[in-house]
C-alpha cells in the first residue's frame, strides 16, 4: 500500500503502452515497405 508502488505500476503501464504503440508503428512501416 505504499504510494511508490502505485507510481511504479503506473510507470510500467505507461512503458508497456509506449512499447505497444512503437511496435504498432513499426508494423505499419513494414507493411507499407513490403506493399
Curated annotation (Swiss-Prot):
GO terms for cellular component: extracellular region. Hemocyanins are copper-containing oxygen carriers occurring freely dissolved in the hemolymph of many mollusks and arthropods. Hemolymph. One of its GO terms (biological process) is oxygen transport. One of its GO terms (molecular function) is oxygen carrier activity. Belongs to the tyrosinase family. Hemocyanin subfamily. This is Hemocyanin A chain. Keywords: Copper, Oxygen transport, Secreted, Transport. Its main location: secreted. It is found in: Secreted, Extracellular space.
Amino acid at each position: 500500500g505504499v504510494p511508490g508502488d502505485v507510481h511504479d505500476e503506473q510507470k510500467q503501464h505507461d512503458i508497456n503502452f509506449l512499447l505497444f504503440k512503437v511496435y504498432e508503428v513499426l508494423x505499419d512501416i513494414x507493411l507499407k515497405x513490403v506493399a
